[in-house]
Regions:
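Residue-level recognition of single "structural anchor" positions
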Residues: 1-331
C-alpha cells in the first residue's frame, strides 16, 4: 500500500476483502503470531471456510475473528466498509457527519452514527505519550446553545442556575507547547465546574511537577500548588505578555468549535466528550517527533492501533447500559 494516497485510492484499495483481511492481520499481529483475544493463547488454527480462528485453550468462546476484541466486534459490516470510514474520520480536519457516511457508504444514518462513535472510541487518547511537561497552557471553554436561541422554558431553567452561559458544557484543555523534538499535545475533558477542586486533579493527572503552567486570569484564577510555576496573563489588558499566553489551547478550541458548529451542527452534552476525543486525536497526530507532517495513511494506522480492548454497544451509546471499560488484551 502506498504511504501517500488519496481517499478515492484508499476506498478502491479496501474494496477487496482479502486485501483488508491481510492488512489488518499484519497490523494486529505484526510478528505473524496470532493470539486469542480472550485468553492470549497462541494455540490457534485458522478456519479458511469461516474466515475465523479457533482457539484450543479451554474456554467457552473458542472461535474468534479479526474484529473480536476491537471496536468492530459484533458488527455485521465487513472490514471493507469499516476501513474507509475510519480513513474519513481521522483525516477530515473538521470531521465527517453521519449523513455523509450514510450517502457515501450506503448504510442507514442510524448505522452511520453508531459507526462514527465506535471510531471515536478508537481515537480516544490512550495516554501512551506520558505526562505533559515544559511549557503547558491550561484553559476552558463553553460548548452549547446560546441563551437567546433557547426555548422560553429552557431559558428560565438556565437562568435559575445563575450561570452566565446557561446550561453550556465546560470543556477543560491542557496543551503542551512544542519544544525540541516534542510537538504540541493536548488533553481535553469535560468538567462539571471551574472550581479548583475540580480542575486541580485534572492538572495533577496530566502535568509533571516543575512544569510552567500558563493561564489567563479569568480561567484558572486560583493559585496553583507550589510544585508548578504558574504564570497568568490578563486578557483585559493584553493577550500575550512575553512568553505567557494561551494562544495554543485557544487555537484548539477554534478547531473544536469549527467541527461541532460546521459539521455536526448540534451535539448532545451526553456525547460531547466523544467529539472532543476525536478532535484531540487529529490535533495530536499532525506532526511527528521530527516536525514532519504525518501522512493520512500513518494517521489511519495510528487510529487502528488503538482499536483493541475497546467495546461500545448501542445500548451503552444511548445510555441504556453502562459502557464497557477498556480491557488489557493482546494486540
Amino acid at each position: 500500500m502506498e504511504l501517500q494516497m488519496t481517499f478515492q485510492q484508499a476506498v478502491q484499495w479496501f474494496t477487496d476483502f482479502d486485501r483488508c483481511f491481510s492488512f489488518m492481520t499484519k497490523l494486529r499481529w505484526p510478528d505473524g503470531k496470532v493470539t486469542c483475544p480472550r485468553c492470549g493463547s497462541q494455540h490457534v488454527k485458522y478456519l479458511d471456510n469461516a474466515r475465523v480462528w479457533k482457539c484450543y485453550a479451554k474456554h467457552s468462546s473458542a472461535k474468534f475473528s479479526l474484529k473480536t476484541g476491537t471496536v468492530f466486534e459484533d458488527s455485521p459490516l465487513g472490514l471493507e466498509m469499516w476501513l474507509p470510514v475510519v480513513w474519513m474520520v481521522v483525516n477530515c480536519k473538521n470531521g465527517v457527519s453521519s449523513w455523509e457516511i450514510h450517502r457515501h457508504m450506503g448504510v442507514t444514518q442510524k448505522t452511520a452514527w453508531f459507526m462514527l462513535h465506535r471510531v471515536r472510541l478508537a481515537m480516544q487518547d490512550d495516554l501512551t505519550g506520558g505526562m505533559l511537561s515544559g511549557d503547558v497552557e491550561v484553559d476552558e471553554t463553553f460548548i452549547g446553545g446560546k441563551m437567546r436561541n433557547m426555548h422560553k422554558d429552557r431559558k428560565v431553567e438556565a437562568q435559575k442556575g445563575g450561570h452566565r452561559d446557561g446550561n453550556k458544557t465546560i470543556v477543560m484543555g491542557i496543551l503542551e507547547r512544542a519544544s525540541g523534538s516534542k510537538q504540541k499535545r493536548v488533553r481535553a475533558s469535560i468538567i462539571s465546574d471551574r472550581k479548583r477542586k475540580t480542575m486541580a486533579p485534572e492538572i495533577a493527572a496530566h502535568v509533571e511537577e516543575g512544569t510552567t503552567i500558563h493561564s489567563d486570569e479569568f480561567g484558572v484564577s486560583w493559585q496553583m500548588p507550589e510544585k508548578y510555576d504558574h504564570q497568568m496573563v490578563n486578557h483585559l489588558s493584553n493577550y500575550v505578555q512575553g512568553n505567557v499566553h494561551t494562544n495554543g489551547i485557544e487555537n484548539f478550541w477554534s478547531l473544536l468549535k469549527r467541527g461541532i458548529g460546521g459539521t455536526y451542527v448540534a451535539v448532545e452534552p451526553f456525547h460531547l466528550f466523544r467529539y472532543v476525543d476525536e478532535q484531540a486525536f487529529r490535533f495530536n497526530t499532525r506532526k511527528d517527533g521530527e516536525g514532519e507532517v504525518i501522512s493520512d495513511f500513518d494517521r489511519f494506522k495510528m487510529a487502528l492501533s488503538q482499536i483493541v480492548g475497546k467495546r461500545l454497544t448501542y445500548k451503552a451509546l444511548t445510555g441504556k447500559e453502562a459502557e464497557t471499560p477498556r480491557e488489557e488484551v493482546p494486540f
